[in-house]
Regions:
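Conserved Radical SAM active-site core
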Residues: 18-143, 148-162
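Short glycine/proline- and charge-enriched loop/turn segments
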Residues: 13-16, 111-112, 178-179
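Radical SAM enzyme [4Fe-4S]-AdoMet core and its adjacent flexible, acidic
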Residues: 163-179
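Local cysteine-cluster metal-coordination motifs and their immediate loop/turn environment
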Residues: 3-16
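Generic, ordered loop/turn and secondary-structure boundary motif
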Residues: 6, 115-118, 176
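Long, contiguous hydrophobic alpha-helical segments, chiefly transmembrane helices and signal peptides
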Residues: 1, 14, 105, 144-145, ...
């Protein structure tokens, strides 16, 4: 699903608080997701992920995601990843059982700078989610965004936080403001 996220992350085009021309749609049908996975696999892509806007994927949408992953796990030979916000231990376990091997959840910046970019959830919530990912035995992918008013100390603090959690992959993004 895309757009209309209730979170107030200042950098995000998906946030309902930010006025962008972001495409808005609900959770895609399973057949579309599986078709996209197969296409990516046929083109040599190593990993495929369902990425959703919003604080967390819950209820019927979460169940749809689990079923889509089960189908992709049976029909495709590709690493499966997920990026669905704040999930609990049970949800992460279900995704893992469905074939997901990696979970993406960026911390965005340092603990000190985080309140400057988001007030609808906390840095500690992000760290806790990553700890749950690691406890489940999944590959943790987490990084941040450069160019949101942070200084070099914030960048270093973010790196230290990621090392303390033991993340396996650290994507770094550069903010490109939407006009």
């Amino acid at each position: 699903r895309s757009g209309k996220c209730p979170e107030d992350c200042k950098y995000c085009a998906q946030s309902a608080h930010n006025h962008t021309d972001c495409e808005v749609y609900d959770f895609l049908p399973e057949e579309d997701i599986v078709k996209a996975c197969k296409l990516n696999e046929s083109e040599g892509v190593d990993r495929f992920s369902i990425v959703t806007a919003g604080k967390a994927l819950t209820g019927e949408e979460f169940e749809k995601a689990v079923h889509a992953y089960e189908t992709m796990n049976k029909e495709c030979d590709i690493e499966l990843c997920a990026s669905m916000g704040f999930l609990n231990a049970e949800q992460l376990h279900r995704l893992h059982e469905a074939g997901v091997t990696s979970y993406h959840h960026n911390i965005e910046t340092s603990r000190r700078n985080f309140p400057n970019i988001c007030t609808t959830h906390t840095y500690d919530m992000k760290i806790e989610t990553l700890k749950l990912v690691k406890a489940e035995g999944m590959w943790a992918c987490s990084g941040g965004i450069i160019g949101m008013g942070e200084d070099w100390e914030d960048r270093l603090d973010m790196a230290i936080s990621l090392a303390e959690v033991g993340v396996d992959s650290i994507p770094l993004n550069a903010l490109m403001p939407i006009k």
